[in-house]
UniProtKB/Swiss-Prot annotation:
Top-level EC class as recorded in UniProt: transferase
Protein's UniProt name: tRNA sulfurtransferase
Disulfide bridges in this chain: C344-C456
GO biological process: thiamine biosynthetic process; thiamine diphosphate biosynthetic process; thiazole biosynthetic process; tRNA 4-thiouridine biosynthesis
Enzyme Commission code(s) on record: 2.8.1.4
Domain (THUMP) ranges: 61-165
PANTHER family: TRNA SULFURTRANSFERASE (PTHR43209:SF1)
Family affiliation: Belongs to the ThiI family.
Keyword annotations: ATP-binding, Cytoplasm, Disulfide bond, Nucleotide-binding, Redox-active center, RNA-binding, Thiamine biosynthesis, Transferase, tRNA-binding
GO cellular component, one term: cytosol
GO molecular function term, any single one: tRNA-uracil-4 sulfurtransferase activity
Domain Rhodanese: 404-482
Length: 482
């Protein structure tokens, strides 16, 4: 079997040296991806296309599908490559190939020709089109908007009978641009923005700020691995996980409510910039869209950018949520994003939309930056190829209950402000307050002879924190969902 890879048009308008470099990189990327399907296949580059020849017919569909997801490819032609002698021979071969497709349909013939011949492309179109029209009684020629277009390519003494055309994702080959670090949360925005930078030729590494224990990290790892495996597996990339719970705890305890959102983002950018510098990455990528939430106004984005010299790319800055969700659906991350948890109490109740630099800096003076340095130093860096095996590890399930026994205590893990606004009172059982960001250090001080029923309003944080505690060896925890 043979595939002809057509280049993304922006590649073809580059200078000769740049075009050759892009084609060489794309050829290598194709080899890296397809070697998993057929180690004997051949990838041959030409000035205006790349040929892929494979012997294992059983892998035809898998190879074709993989090619449609490699950045830099405009479209793929699945072809049958045969010799020919003259125009009548071309017609006879086209009749055998296309007869069934043309029964009862309107059609036209389009020919591309390279080499020296005693006929032109139009001559072939007329001869083959007329012959097909005569020999297939139910078919009818229609030059504009036909139901079927018969594509033929003539190159020297070879005829390419095009059996199918399949659209690629376009863009530039990965590796033609420099590396970037995507701040990935597993939601709609960060997944789409990561894809857009891969499509533009960047090798995308991932940085995840963990606010909810191992279960949340596993979910985000799965999203990152999916994106890499589907669109970027030609290159090795890093997945860096930073435990940001201590940072969030410090913010919630010391920072004024209205400034929390902007300061949290500034801390994330500081941390990600340190990671980027460590690994020689040139830019950060975020999924922020202008005005989508309070921290994404122009004033706040400028203040967030000011904490680092590292370039921050925001490919979704002018996109609305509906457009982003549609893109997530197209690339296959929608289902991941819909089930990814959102945390209760992490963001302030009345965030500022126009933060003042002096106020932000004054609030940050209360922050212990050694905490930020420590979590960055302890960041977990893994090769994304290892994630598939790691995420198959068993995640201990935590029992969810809607009632309680005599030895049970409800543990309200909401933030202090939420607890003050809506105190939890349940008749017949004790309620103890311990904000989620203190669980990792304070839960061990509680009476371990009691069973603790973790509770928050949405039930997401309570489940993830219960999973985290189970992983730490505490088996006396359940999730309370009345």
């Amino acid at each position: 079997m043979k595939f002809i890879i057509k280049l993304f048009p922006e590649i073809t308008i580059k200078s000769q040296s740049v075009r050759l470099r892009f084609i060489k990189i794309l050829t290598g990327n194709i080899r890296n991806v397809l070697k998993h399907y057929d180690e004997t296949l051949a990838v041959v580059r030409h000035w205006d296309n790349i040929e892929v020849r494979a012997k294992d017919e059983n892998q035809r569909l898998a190879i074709r599908d993989a090619l449609t997801r490699i950045p830099g490819i405009h479209h793929i032609l699945e072809v049958e490559d045969v010799p020919f002698t003259d125009m009548h021979d071309i017609f006879e071969k086209a009749l055998v190939q296309y007869r069934d497709q043309l029964e009862g349909k309107t059609f036209c013939v389009r020919v591309k020709r390279r080499g020296k011949h005693d006929f032109s492309s139009i001559d072939v179109e007329r001869y083959v089109g007329g012959g097909l029209n005569q020999h297939i009684e139910s078919a009818r020629v229609k030059l504009t908007n036909p139901e079927v277009t018969v594509h033929l390519e003539v190159e020297d003494d070879r005829l390419l009978l095009i059996k199918g055309r399949y659209e690629g994702i376009g863009g530039f080959p990965i590796g033609t641009q420099e590396d970037v670090l995507s701040l990935i949360s597993g939601g709609f925005d960060s997944g789409v923005s990561s894809y857009m930078l891969m499509r533009r030729g960047c090798r995308v590494h991932y940085c995840f700020f963990n606010l909810g224990g191992a279960a949340h990290e596993i979910g985000v790892r799965q999203v990152a691995h999916y994106l890499w495996n589907r669109f970027g597996s030609s290159h090795r990339v890093r997945f860096v996980a930073i435990n940001f719970e201590p940072v969030v705890g410090e913010i919630l305890e010391k920072i004024d409510d209205g400034q929390m959102g902007v300061i949290l983002k500034r801390m994330m950018v500081r941390a990600a910039s340190k990671v980027a510098e460590r690994y020689g990455v040139q830019a950060l990528v975020t999924g922020e869209a202008l005005g989508q939430v309070s921290s994404q106004t122009l004033t706040n984005l400028r203040l967030i950018d000011n904490v680092s010299d590292t370039l921050i790319l925001r490919p979704l800055i002018s996109y609305d949520k509906e457009h982003i969700i549609n893109l997530a659906r197209q690339i296959g991350t929608e289902d991941f994003a819909r089930t990814m948890p959102e945390y209760c109490g992490v963001i302030s109740k009345s965030p500022t939309v126009k933060a003042v630099k002096s106020k932000i800096e004054a609030e940050e003076e209360k922050f212990d930056f050694s905490i930020l340095d420590k979590v960055v130093e302890e960041a977990n860096n893994v090769d994304i190829r290892e994630i598939a095996q790691q995420t198959e590890q068993e995640v201990v399930e935590v029992e969810t209950v809607n009632g309680f026994g005599p030895n049970d205590v409800i543990l309200d893990i909401r933030s202090v402000d939420e607890q003050e606004d809506k105190p939890l009172k349940v008749e017949g059982i004790d309620v103890v307050s311990l904000p989620f960001y203190k669980l990792s250090t304070k839960f061990g001080d509680l009476d371990q002879n009691r069973t603790w029923l973790l509770w928050c309003e949405r039930g997401v944080m309570s489940r993830l924190q219960a999973l985290y505690l189970r992983e730490q060896g505490f088996n006396n925890v359940k999730v309370y969902r009345p």
